[in-house]
Amino acid sequence: GIYESVIWKNNHALGANGFDINYLNPIIFFRPVEYSINSPDNMLIGLNLKYKVNARSFLFSQLVLDEFTLNELKANNGYWANKYGYQIGYKCFDLLSIPNLTIHLEQNYTRPFTYSHWNSANYGHYNEELAHPLGANFIENILILSYRKKRVTTNLKYIQASYGADYVGDTVSYGSNIYNDYNDRSASYGIDMFNGNKTDLKFTQFNLGYILNPTTNLKLEFSLVNRILKSETNESKTLFYSFSIRSDLFNHYYDF
């Protein structure tokens, strides 16, 4: 599938467009329209692909282009406005022909300053990122293993991420925080991945549960979490465990 989106700001300066009727055009690739009307809005285009390997497994991927200059990309000079990202992954059910054993592998990558803008028309909402909790300027690897035997459930999740954060007290934007103005960047060239305060995150979670009521998914569960965060300026380690009784809707997003 191919998709395109636009985020606009209603309170532009006098003479700016705000919402334009052209944005209702259902035809993909209307980016030239944006240029023709001198739009200050934030647009991107993307592609998603899914390939079914067999009845029990599939590959999936996404590509997003925020801004893109082919000549600058070929020059390989770290041009700041080559803003893009990708996701690639694999999921398999009944792994190794073992019933109810599932594996999920995934990698996410986003260049610095992707999803950001020179004004508040970024890809965020209520001070949260719409695309990924790490914002931009990161690479993330995910492994999830889950298994169920009758009423016993287990789940192991491991996440490793590296990203370039901003320095505390520094007004320069290094491309991770999408709420920062990209005009406040440190340079226009030589912007490499993990630009800024390089930070490494390791997150491990193990869950063991017993389903009391399959209809409502009411279960007893034990959870153990280990989180290690290391940067150029800070290091923190967190280990905690919990016991719970709950009937839940699954939340798979703990990678922040």
Predicted segments — roles?
Residues G1-F256:
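Exposed, low-structure sequence patches enriched in small/polar residues
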